């Protein structure tokens, strides 16, 4: 099934959001580096790389279906520069929640259009986002350890 113009736009929006997530994670890694939290910064850099992999999965899906993937405008990260470790993880969680909601919206749109071809990819992403949010939530439990 060929992608409709509406679904193509929604997939392109998701591609852009995944790339934006990569930039957000990279900015958060810079904040962690500024706090001399090298392990945390490394984890955030790996997350940034993973978001690019996610964007590529969506790009491949669009391309495999004979459509043209198009990256949209990517906003500069709005996360502050003077964040605590807890605030960094809270910002990561907030962005993961934003990505999760966008994936659920894309899932609902493809379902409404009867696009079963997108289901395997989107099922994978729904599972992935559960894991991503759970990890970020676990790190926000640092609050109990902050002085």
Task: Indicate residue ranges for each PLM-predicted region.
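Extreme N-terminal tail/first-helix region
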Residues: 1-12
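Acidic/histidine-rich alpha-helical segments that form the ligand environment
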Residues: 10-17, 21, 25-28, 60-61, ...
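Conserved alpha-helical segments that form or flank metal/cofactor-binding pockets of metalloenzymes
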Residues: 33-73, 136-139
């Amino acid at each position: 099934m060929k992608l409709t113009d509406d679904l193509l736009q929604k997939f392109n929006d998701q591609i852009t959001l995944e790339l934006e997530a990569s930039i957000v994670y990279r900015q958060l890694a810079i904040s962690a580096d500024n706090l001399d939290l090298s392990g945390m910064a490394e984890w955030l850099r790996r997350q940034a790389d993973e978001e690019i992999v996610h964007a590529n999965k969506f790009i491949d899906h669009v391309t495999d279906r004979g459509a043209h993937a198009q990256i949209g405008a990517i906003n500069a990260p709005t996360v502050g520069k003077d964040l605590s470790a807890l605030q960094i993880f809270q910002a990561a969680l907030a962005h993961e929640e934003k990505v999760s909601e966008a994936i659920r919206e894309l899932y609902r749109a493809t379902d409404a259009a009867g696009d079963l071809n997108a289901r395997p990819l989107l099922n994978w992403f729904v599972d992935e986002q559960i894991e991503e949010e759970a990890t970020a939530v676990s790190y926000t439990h640092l609050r109990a350890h902050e002085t």
